[in-house]
Amino acid sequence: MTKERFKELMQPIADGLFGKQKPYHMQQGTPPVVRPVGMIVEDLCAISDDEWAKYAFSREPLNGKFTEEQRVELTRKAMACGREYAERVVKEHGVRDPEKLAEKLGMKVDYPRMPQSTDRVLFAEFREPNKIHIYMDGVDKGEVLFAEPGVRHALTAQLDIKKLLLGHELFHWVEEKYRKEIWTRTYRLRLWEVGPVHNDSTVMVLGEIAAMAFTQALNNLHYSPYVMDAYLVYGYSPEAASALYEEMMTFAGRTPRLPEEPEPAE
């Protein structure tokens, strides 16, 4: 595969991932080694919460303002925030299932095939005040991959892609409702200060990290939903998914595996 063809494949995926990431290989224009999807999810499901911090912050506009220790600390706090609010809404409404919870919260959820604008891949989105779209093209492609070797074992039968996406988007509604008190909105980073004058900013990625923890708690998953960044993209481009896999593993301080060499012919 040429660099030009790889860039062409990657372009519509760049801004449409679950975590809205752009893989390093896209920036470099170098095609990755394509891995089996079962290998990808097996390795990514083993990454710990702290190890996801560097990947999560990698596209945060203010990323350079933080040390590695601060990224880990903020990731822990954002995840704790997401889990706290998951348990809060479950206790308040008496249901954990994301579809039933969405109904209790008065959300209008629909399941169109694809977004109206088809220039990029998009899996789900929240639109104020109370609309959530789950795009079934990506969901269906992900469900087809369940049949691939190792996928169901890694992701477990507990995974329902629609509910995972829905839970993630529900957090954005929760975050908006509690915007005056929720930690992901009240945390501020001081950008500069001159005497009594200063400029503070929210940190966008904290809401995404919390949303991942929120839907993880609702769906009772043992692995981070960030795994879906690579998994759902695989249905569109194994090359793009493999690029994300390499980047995720590297950011986590782990060595990306290569596909096994084929057995010699008899």
Model-derived features with residue positions:
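Long, positively charged binding patches that form subdomain-scale interaction surfaces
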Residues: V121, P149-L165, E169
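A structural signal for well-ordered alpha-helical scaffolds and beta->alpha junctions
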Residues: G94-V95, G167, E208
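Conserved binding/catalytic microenvironments
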Residues: R127-L145, A157, R179-I182, R188-L189, ...
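A solvent-exposed, charged loop/short amphipathic helix patch at secondary-structure junctions
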Residues: F146-L155, L189-V197
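Active-site recognition of the HExxH zinc-binding catalytic motif
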Residues: K163-E181
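Metalloprotease/metallohydrolase-associated module, dominated by Zn2+-dependent proteases
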Residues: T186-E266
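A metal-dependent hydrolase signature that marks the N-terminal structural subdomain at the beginning
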Residues: M1-V144, P149-V151
